[in-house]
Amino acid sequence: MSCSPLVPFLSLLLLLFLPEVPRAATASLPQGSSEGAATCKAHDLCLFGPRRLLSAPPVNVSLYYESLCGACRYFLVRNLFPTWLMVMEIMNITLVPYGNAQERNVSGTWEFTCQHGELECKLNKVEACLLDKLEKEAAFLTIVCMEEMEDMEKKLGPCLQLYVPEVSPESIMECATGKRGTELMHENAQLTDALQPPHEYVPWVLVNEKPLTDPSQLLSSVCELYQGTEKPDICSSMADAPREVCYK
């Protein structure tokens, strides 16, 4: 994929900093959460506070992918991320960076061969370590930030600085190049190999454990499958969307 500069990503990122973000694009605080309100100051990025209690379980969206796959990067940045912005309060995202890689046990050590070469294996481990070491939403946003960039490895530091400045890129790279990175990749290999039905390609997307054949339908699928009494506003507007054809 020919990736664009930071500008397109920033157009989406600006949504996170708007003083009055639409309800469908925010993490709502439960009533009486004075502690969260006190600690979340006006200049902070307050996406990681407690959310309101849901009247039904969130919709589970799982993405099985590999870090340098063009189609995976497109789905992550252009489909999954915008959907999360709009309906984050009713969806739960799981990322599994491994994809079409292969593993083998060599003298008791797991070695990996990745579809797009050694760099992809390294970046898969980096993203696995982000998911292992950071809070879930911070890891997701950092990975989206990296996947938007041309040189993902060099952008690890700036993306961490944007969302979790207290975490150093050196600590993530230490994980990725060490024993923990190998363990995480092996775990992701097992998760990927256990898929039923097996994945046919990447990105392989599951919505409530069922494959999503049309990535463009992610938002509508999440809205449809959520069984709660209150849905984000965007779900109501989608229900009133015009037909694709006009009958005579």
Curated annotation (Swiss-Prot):
Any Pfam family the entry gives: GILT
Cellular localization per UniProt: Secreted; Lysosome
GO biological process: antigen processing and presentation of exogenous peptide antigen via MHC class I; antigen processing and presentation of exogenous peptide antigen via MHC class II; negative regulation of fibroblast proliferation; protein stabilization
Family under the similarity heading: Belongs to the GILT family.
GO molecular function: oxidoreductase activity, acting on a sulfur group of donors; oxidoreductase activity, acting on a sulfur group of donors, disulfide as acceptor
Subunit structure: Dimer; disulfide-linked.
PTM: N-glycosylated. Sugar chains contain mannose-6-phosphate.
Note: Both precursor form and mature form have thiol reductase activity.
Function: Lysosomal thiol reductase that can reduce protein disulfide bonds. May facilitate the complete unfolding of proteins destined for lysosomal degradation. Plays an important role in antigen processing. Facilitates the generation of MHC class II-restricted epitodes from disulfide bond-containing antigen by the endocytic reduction of disulfide bonds. Also facilitates MHC class I-restricted recognition of exogenous antigens containing disulfide bonds by CD8+ T-cells or crosspresentation.
Name assigned to this protein: Gamma-interferon-inducible lysosomal thiol reductase
Coiled-coil stretches: none
Organism of this sequence: Rattus norvegicus
Residue pairs linked by disulfide bridges in the UniProt entry: 69-72
Glycan attachment sites: 60, 92, 105
Gene: Ifi30
